[in-house]
Amino acid sequence: DVYKRQAAAIAQEQTNGNGLGDIGLSANYRLFGERGWRPETVLTAGVTAPTGRAPYGLDWKVIERDDDDYIRFAVPKEQPTGNGVWQANVGLSMVKTADPAILFANLGYVHSFPRGFNDIDSNPDTVNPGDVKLGGSVYFGAGVAFAFNERTSLSLSFSDRISARASTRFQGGQWMKVIGSDANAASLNLGVTYALNQHTTLVTLLGIGLTPDAPDFTLAFKIPYML
């Protein structure tokens, strides 16, 4: 009973992370306008830079050690704010008017580029440099939107992102798959879009996770600008 109480107390340690996350930049190009049965189709391409705190080489806070100095429990002093690698994405978005509703769907792929780090070991007592390669991700979604007036619309959609396993390679070693790093993150989304002017809109999006890999909920704000 004493041991169980000690273990429970150790598990209550809490850390957080503040700071700049990964910065992304994307551009859209309209391939086709809506005509007859054909939806408006937009090509999207973008890149994400690893400007946030990477989840590798973090400083650790050791909470408990055994009598032989073996670490029983440790947590990062600060949580990561990014994934640590460069990423590029390409996708298609389609919109079709079905008065009074608007139907939309999207499909895309995210590619992650390998990157080296001074330490990729999860043991705070060791330093092992190496490379990390995140698995590619396929994302897709579909939904419907209703316009309240010329400026405001409400949308309801489903989105999913399926990611392959990541791989790591210690310096001088071979690539090895990371067990449990694959994911299937699906969510139900509720959004409100408000047109600020002819070129700029404000998008508010609330997401509710549907799978274990998805966050319980997310809240995002975007301000797209159209030339």
Residue ranges and their predicted role:
Residues 27, 41-45, 90-92, 105-107, ...:
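Membrane-embedded beta-strand positions of outer-membrane beta-barrel proteins
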Residues 28-30, 91-97, 145, 193, ...:
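Transmembrane beta-barrel domains of outer membrane proteins
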Residues 20-26, 40, 85-89, 135-139, ...:
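Transmembrane beta-barrel architecture of outer-membrane proteins
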Residues 116-227:
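Outer membrane beta-barrel transmembrane domains
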